[in-house]
């Protein structure tokens, strides 16, 4: 399957799990979805299936965390066999836990190793192997530092697509959350990168809050990755196909999306899933609408109760004024 990076939803730890992705996919057929970051160690040695997903989630990219080329190649091969549409290497996450495993943003300082990792994966898979990174780390935040990284990883590793989180990462002193908010955004640097590496596919990530903003970035770049906004106000995804991909399909109402989740939820509950693990991703669906607070509160107070099922969502939906027709 060919897919476009024109719009994607960022890999977000503890957020973009398979329930979240199924929900997002009901709103947009075209948006590229990413898994949460999965470490090579979890896939190779962990108990449980870390590569499971729903067929409906395509186009779907697996984000890997690791720095051992052999392990990454092994995981990439498994992922391709399971049907993933893209393999993405995390060179952007700044958390201590990640650095201790020698992957994430600290790898920006080792571009040759990143190139080796990408090359090892490309050797064993046919799907695209991409890199998500930052504009710099700590005091290594010159434009030359970024261009050296991209040059080496693209020329020696064969990477043709980069998603640039337009902030640098502080590897010590800031939490991952602070690293998403405190370092200033520098979109022009990503635009410049695209001009200087016009043969590469370059997407941007960081601080994008609307499709209008995405359209502005798309005048300069190949793709836009939306993170927290797509999670906290997911309904923005409902008009992506029409606004960015030229679809003529009608935009779904919020209530339709809720009702389309019912069969999935019933099937998951029958397999022993816990309702709250699914509905937590839906809390922001009515963001900024009358009744939104009551919707959120009803789900939050009831989804965790033993034996709770669809009636929780049905009752929550009844809190949204009918005359809104949403």
From Swiss-Prot:
Regarding protein family, the annotation reads: Belongs to the Dus family. DusA subfamily.
Q: Which GO terms describe its molecular function?
A: flavin adenine dinucleotide binding; FMN binding; tRNA binding; tRNA-dihydrouridine20 synthase activity; tRNA-dihydrouridine20a synthase activity
Name the site position(s) for Interacts with tRNA.
90, 177, 180, 293, 296
EC number(s) reported in the record: 1.3.1.-, 1.3.1.91
Q: Which reaction does it catalyse?
A: 5,6-dihydrouridine(20) in tRNA + NADP(+) = uridine(20) in tRNA + NADPH + H(+); 5,6-dihydrouridine(20) in tRNA + NAD(+) = uridine(20) in tRNA + NADH + H(+); 5,6-dihydrouridine(20a) in tRNA + NADP(+) = uridine(20a) in tRNA + NADPH + H(+); 5,6-dihydrouridine(20a) in tRNA + NAD(+) = uridine(20a) in tRNA + NADH + H(+)
What protein name applies here?
tRNA-dihydrouridine(20/20a) synthase
* Entries under HAMAP family matching the protein: DusA_subfam
Species the sequence originates in: Vibrio parahaemolyticus serotype O3:K6 (strain RIMD 2210633)
Gene name of the encoded protein = dusA
Which co-factors does it depend on? FMN
Q: Which residues form the active site?
A: 93
* Function (record text): Catalyzes the synthesis of 5,6-dihydrouridine (D), a modified base found in the D-loop of most tRNAs, via the reduction of the C5-C6 double bond in target uridines. Specifically modifies U20 and U20a in tRNAs.
């Amino acid at each position: 399957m060919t897919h476009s990076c024109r719009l994607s939803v960022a890999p977000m730890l503890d957020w973009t799990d398979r329930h979240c992705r199924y929900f997002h996919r009901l709103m947009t057929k075209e948006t590229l979805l990413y898994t949460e970051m999965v470490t090579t160690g979890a896939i190779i040695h962990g108990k449980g299936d870390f590569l499971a997903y729903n067929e409906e989630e395509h186009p779907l990219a697996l984000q890997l965390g690791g720095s051992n080329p052999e392990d990454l190649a092994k995981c990439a091969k498994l992922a391709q066999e399971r049907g993933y549409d893209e393999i993405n290497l995390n060179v952007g996450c700044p958390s201590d836990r990640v650095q201790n495993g020698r992957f994430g943003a600290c790898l920006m300082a080792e571009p040759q190793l990143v190139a080796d990792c990408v090359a090892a994966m490309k050797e064993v898979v046919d799907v695209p192997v991409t890199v998500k990174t930052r504009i710099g780390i700590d005091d290594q935040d010159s434009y030359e530092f970024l261009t050296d990284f991209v040059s080496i990883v693209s020329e020696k590793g064969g990477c043709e697509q980069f998603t640039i989180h337009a902030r640098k990462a502080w590897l010590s002193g800031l939490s991952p959350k602070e690293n998403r908010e405190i370092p200033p955004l520098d979109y022009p640097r990503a635009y410049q990168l695209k001009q200087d590496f016009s043969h590469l596919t370059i997407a941007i990530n960081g601080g994008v809050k609307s499709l209008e903003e995405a359209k502005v970035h798309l005048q300069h770049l190949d793709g836009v990755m939306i993170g927290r906004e797509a999670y906290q106000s997911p309904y923005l995804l409902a008009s992506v196909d029409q606004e960015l991909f030229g679809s003529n399909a009608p935009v779904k109402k919020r209530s339709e999306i809720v009702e389309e989740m019912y069969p999935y939820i019933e099937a998951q509950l029958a397999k022993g899933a816990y309702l709250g693990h699914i509905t937590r991703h839906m809390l922001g669906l009515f963001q900024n609408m009358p009744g939104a607070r009551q919707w959120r509160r009803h789900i939050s107070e009831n989804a965790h109760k033993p034996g709770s099922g669809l009636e929780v969502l049905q009752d929550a939906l009844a809190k949204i004024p009918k005359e809104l027709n949403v």
